[in-house]
């Protein structure tokens, strides 16, 4: 289909008929009724039983945010451009005619998509050393006629992990012929993670050691993405150099600041390992902890000085007596 538009005309009077048509990502779809526009008083358009917009003779109002830039709605047609996977669902137009007749147009849309997210996140970084966590997550996979569960592999030629997809009933949507992520099974069941370390001054002899691939394959279909992880480290090292060159601070202060920055990054990354989706550390809380610690130290010093002074006075008074 490519990006060519496909026009579907369905005429329904006081009846609701549902058909299912599959589209590819970036296709355009037009759902219309043949009813003469001059006979229509107003039309309400729905997506999964939620109102998208209300079209009248004068205007169309009530667009939901995710459709604003890609949808054109009128009394007779619902036009969606550049389909996305999440656009899959049931669309319905209910036209109220001026003579009291109601015309209902309903269409099930299934958008075929293989959504594979392959990302790399730096866990630890110094001027010479870089550790990256590589994560591959499958959020949608079209079976394309396959009768066997798909599998996924993440890694390089020499270092990789393997995972068969779960085949639980709630992971498979029969109408869409697709394994999808979502409740109640955790999304992590369709994700693999692997860590790799890089030395800045190591001579790269085999580029395959830097290229990580995420393979998704089934009986008659395969799909993969590639990511050069060393490039992620190189960009971080370059940023460190730029910061050093741009800074006017003394070298010792630079080193201290970089060490503190590395320590804070390591603490944050360790926290991320426990919960990859947790919020960043609250800066206000961190400042408060530092202030309380400093005040405690100052208080201890004052108490010690006071104790020494009292002791000396007591000793001198004893000598005088």
UniProtKB/Swiss-Prot annotation:
Segments traversing the membrane: 286-306
Q: Which residues form the signal peptide?
A: 1-20
Highest taxon of the source? Viruses
What are the inducing conditions? Answer: Expressed in the early phase of the viral replicative cycle.
GO annotation terms (biological process): viral process
Q: Which UniProt keywords apply?
A: Glycoprotein, Host cell membrane, Host membrane, Membrane, Signal, Transmembrane, Transmembrane helix
What Pfam families does this protein map onto? Pox_I6
Q: Where is it mostly found?
A: host cell
Glycosylated sites: 36, 41, 72, 79, 108, 144, 220, 245
Disulphide bonds in the chain: none
Q: Which GO terms describe its cellular component?
A: host cell plasma membrane; membrane
Q: Where in the cell is it found?
A: Host cell membrane
Q: How does it sit in the membrane?
A: Single-pass membrane protein
Q: What does this protein do?
A: Plays a role in the spread of virus to neighboring cells ex vivo.
The family note in this entry says: Belongs to the orthopoxvirus OPG049 family.
Q: What is this protein called?
A: Protein OPG049
> Which species does this protein come from?
Vaccinia virus (strain L-IVP)
Q: What is the lineage of its organism?
A: Viruses, Varidnaviria, Bamfordvirae, Nucleocytoviricota, Pokkesviricetes
Q: Which gene encodes it?
A: OPG049
């Amino acid at each position: 289909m490519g990006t060519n538009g496909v026009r579907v005309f369905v005429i329904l009077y006081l009846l609701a008929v549902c058909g299912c048509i599959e589209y590819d990502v970036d296709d355009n779809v037009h759902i219309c009724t043949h009813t003469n526009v001059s006979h229509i008083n107003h039309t309400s358009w729905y997506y999964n039983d939620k109102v998208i917009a209300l079209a009248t003779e004068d205007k169309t109002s009530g667009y939901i945010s995710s459709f604003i830039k890609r949808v054109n709605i009128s009394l007779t047609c619902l036009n969606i451009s550049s389909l996305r996977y999440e656009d899959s669902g049931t669309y319905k137009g209910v036209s109220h005619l001026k003579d009291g007749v109601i015309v209902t147009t309903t269409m099930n849309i299934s958008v075929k998509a293989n959504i594979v997210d392959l990302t790399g996140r730096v866990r630890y970084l110094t001027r010479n050393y870089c550790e990256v966590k590589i994560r591959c997550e499958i959020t949608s996979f079209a079976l394309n006629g396959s009768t066997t569960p798909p599998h996924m592999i993440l890694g390089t030629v020499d270092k990789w992990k393997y995972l068969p997809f779960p085949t639980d009933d709630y992971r498979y949507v029969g109408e869409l012929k697709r394994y999808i992520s979502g409740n109640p099974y955790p999304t992590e069941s369709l994700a693999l993670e692997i860590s790799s370390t890089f030395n800045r001054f190591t001579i790269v002899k085999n580029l395959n050691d830097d290229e990580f691939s995420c393979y998704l394959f089934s009986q008659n279909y395969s799909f993969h993405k590639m990511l050069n992880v060393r490039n992620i480290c190189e960009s971080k090292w370059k940023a460190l150099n730029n910061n050093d060159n741009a800074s006017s601070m003394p070298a010792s202060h630079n080193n201290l600041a970089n060490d503190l920055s590395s320590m804070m990054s390591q603490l944050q990354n360790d926290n991320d390992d426990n919960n990859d989706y947790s919020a960043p550390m609250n800066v206000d809380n961190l400042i408060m902890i530092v202030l309380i610690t400093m005040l405690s130290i100052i208080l201890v010093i004052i108490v010690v000085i006071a104790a020494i002074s009292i002791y000396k006075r007591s000793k001198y008074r004893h000598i005088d007596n």
